[in-house]
């Protein structure tokens, strides 16, 4: 069944469908909390254990590696065993990993725990996008998947505020346990709310799951999606990882640099919600490039124009709106690319491919900054993958539109 086939979608919103989308939004908030909390506790953990920044980078990379493993090896099982079972299993992995993180006694124990958490997150990201698309009416699928994605940046804002106030009081171990408890709470809610849709032989992909993505009718769209998510996450993770430091380089104080990071994440939430609403009126293949190219303009202004503190913070907010708002449109686009029988597999592979860009982006940025590259040249360099991302999304969107009109 095609993602665009009206026969595979409910005719209108149902209470059950709205509840499923709301639950997926909440789960994605927990995902966001479990990911970004490490960046907030890293300085305290480093002081307590005497961990050097490069060793701390191993912890961050462990989470990304886990996401790739979950996306490639676990998420495709959702197409064979059903969304509900795999989401519950992934939440269980995340719960074990997060709770274990609060009791670890060494860096390598923490690395192992973060791999578990990453496996769960990579799985959930793919399965939830597929589930939200299938719970929504045909004309609201892109909006539903986009709304679910908005949970992640919203969680980043709240997690930062909570960490800023409670880290000095609780310490980093208790913060990890609180995040783990929030993940555990999602298990019974998911068990009660998500429908237990049985997977029939007709629903399952014929032949190897990966082979379905490379079938003649999907190959071009799959490769374009991979280019888009890889190059998009190169830029996105560069900004997310370095925006406080980049803001300081642009002339802000350390405190205002932290505010710039918070405003970026709030902008990401606003942008993702805006993209979701716009997707009901305009094709994603046009909205995503418009957002991403606008973010390139904002990035160049941020890196090359001397501005007052309020204006600099405003531009950081605009980058969040346009960059992450545009990038998060990739997941409803991915849900539209693949038929139901291989949707979780397709999105899972896209999640995994994107993690490669997520690793390379911050590393390249750190190297360029260490070599003394100016902010203007630095942002110009990242506009190259940004334009590639926009072009790939545009072409993939055209192929989806052509299929829907066929």
Predicted regions located by residue number:
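Cytoplasmic helix-loop-helix junction between adjacent transmembrane helices
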Residues: 113-150
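C-terminal membrane-cytosol helix-exit motif in multi-pass small-molecule transporters
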Residues: 181-200, 389-397
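Extracytoplasmic gate region of multi-pass secondary transporters
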Residues: 38-39, 217-272
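Helix-loop-helix hairpin linking two adjacent transmembrane segments in secondary transporters
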Residues: 147-192
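Helix-breaking motifs and short loop linkers at transmembrane-helix boundaries and internal kinks
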Residues: 50, 82, 103-109, 137, ...
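Conserved MFS/SLC helix-loop-helix module at the cytosolic interface between two early adjacent transmembrane helices
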Residues: 69-107
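Cytosolic juxtamembrane N-terminal segment immediately preceding the first transmembrane helix
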Residues: 1-33
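Paired small-residue
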Residues: 93, 97, 108-116, 310-318
């Amino acid at each position: 069944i095609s993602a665009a086939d009206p026969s595979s979608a409910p005719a209108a919103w149902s209470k059950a469908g709205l509840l499923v989308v709301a639950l997926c939004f909440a789960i994605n908030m927990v995902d966001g909390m479990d990911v970004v909390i490490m960046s907030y506790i890293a300085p305290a953990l480093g002081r307590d254990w005497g961990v050097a920044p490069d060793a701390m980078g191993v912890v961050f990379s462990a989470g990304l590696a886990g996401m790739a493993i979950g996306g490639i090896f676990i998420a495709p099982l959702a197409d064979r065993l059903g969304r509900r079972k795999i989401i519950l299993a992934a939440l269980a992995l995340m719960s074990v990993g997060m709770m274990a993180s609060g009791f670890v006694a060494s860096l390598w124990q923490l690395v192992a725990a973060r791999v578990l958490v990453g496996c769960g997150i990579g799985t959930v990201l793919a399965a939830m996008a597929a589930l939200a698309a299938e719970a929504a009416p045909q004309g609201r699928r892109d909006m539903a998947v986009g709304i679910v994605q908005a949970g992640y940046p919203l969680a980043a804002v709240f997690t930062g505020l909570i960490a800023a106030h409670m880290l000095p009081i609780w310490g980093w171990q208790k913060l990890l346990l609180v995040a783990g408890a929030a993940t555990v709470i999602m298990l019974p809610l998911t068990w009660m709310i998500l429908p237990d849709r049985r997977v029939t032989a007709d629903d399952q992909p014929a032949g190897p799951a990966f082979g379905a993505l490379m079938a003649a009718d999907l190959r071009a769209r799959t490769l374009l999606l991979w280019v888009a998510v890889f190059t998009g996450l190169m830029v996105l993770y560069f900004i997310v990882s370095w925006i406080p430091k980049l803001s300081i380089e642009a002339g802000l104080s350390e405190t205002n640099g932290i505010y710039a990071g918070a405003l970026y994440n709030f902008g990401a939430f606003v942008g993702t919600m805006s993209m979701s609403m716009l997707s009901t009126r305009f094709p994603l293949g046009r909205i995503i490039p418009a957002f991403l190219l606008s973010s390139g303009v904002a990035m160049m202004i941020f890196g090359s124009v001397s501005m007052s503190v309020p204006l600099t913070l405003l531009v950081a907010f605009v980058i969040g709106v346009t960059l992450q708002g545009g990038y998060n449109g990739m997941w409803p686009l991915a849900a539209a690319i693949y038929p139901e029988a291989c949707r979780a597999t397709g999105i899972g592979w896209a999640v995994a491919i994107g993690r490669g860009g997520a690793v390379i982006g911050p590393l390249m940025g750190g190297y360029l900054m260490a070599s003394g590259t100016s902010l203007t040249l630095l942002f110009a360099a990242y506009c190259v993958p940004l334009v590639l991302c926009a072009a790939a999304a545009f072409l993939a969107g055209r192929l989806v539109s052509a299929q829907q009109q066929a």
